[in-house]
Amino acid sequence: MSKALEIRGLRKVYDNGFEALKGIDLCVEEGDFFALLGPNGAGKSTTIGIICSLVKKTAGSVSVFGHSIDSELALAKKEIGIVPQEFNFSNFESVWDIVVNQAGYYGLTRELAEQRAETYLRQLDLWEKRNTASRMLSGGMKRRLMIARALVHEPRLLILDEPTAGVDIELRRSMWAFLKEINQRGTTIILTTHYLEEAESLCRNIAIIDSGEIAENTAMKTLLKQLHRETFVLDTKEPLPDTISIAGFETHKTDEQMLEVALEKGGSLNAVFAALSEQGVEVTSMRNKANRLEELFVSLLAKS
């Protein structure tokens, strides 16, 4: 499988001496749904800016589907659709004109531009707003408009910088469904987000960047398995005592008849069952509670 994005030794030092990127390497395979996570100031936006030729790199190389941004910039840019974090279109243009005019920058005929504009506006539930000035749209509609604009020339690589910031939960999930659909049709997607649930739900692979360096770069499933502890939820037959303590284990009473127990991966719950039995508590069922990406994110940044 070919590489949609290949970054080698990428550095960026700003005029004030701040080193935003410290020689990072990053590869994204064609067809992947890839998450780039990191705290504010970690280097995410700088990386995206360089990929899209909005920021000038200090050193290193960037290729998009084999096209170097140094020697084949025009070809590289044709492969990319970018959905920036901030709204960056005219407040007075209509939804229709914003999408159709964007297609013109990539050499599409008017007829083809209009066909694609209709397709994406319908898919993103904006067709009824096509003659509306962008300033009249809600924040969620503006987000969807930016996605339609980014897709109208049908790039093979879509980059989304915080695409659901400020979007309500229902709309966010509908956007997730749309992004999954276009990824399944073959579009490679790179996502930056502060909603860790978003990355966990959508992405197959993930890189975590911190202080201009890659702290982790692996499959999402592999990353989640790296958590050192597992949490189990125990349901009990009788109400639990007001206070309950089990030596050597971290416990948390979440309901009258529900107890969470954390232990090292591979550890045994036998001692927990024995301790509860001694306190007159019978366990009726047990389930593993999935560790969330937030925990791992904090853990990795602490290590780096």
Give short role names for the model-derived ranges.
Residues 176-264:
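ABC transporter nucleotide-binding domain
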Residues 100, 104, 111-129:
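Conserved ABC ATPase "signature" region
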Residues 133-137:
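Conserved ABC ATPase signature
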Residues 158-161:
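Catalytic Walker B motif of ABC-type/P-loop ATPase nucleotide-binding domains
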Residues 60-71, 75-76:
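Conserved ABC transporter NBD signature motif
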Residues 154:
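Conserved catalytic motifs of ABC-family nucleotide-binding domains
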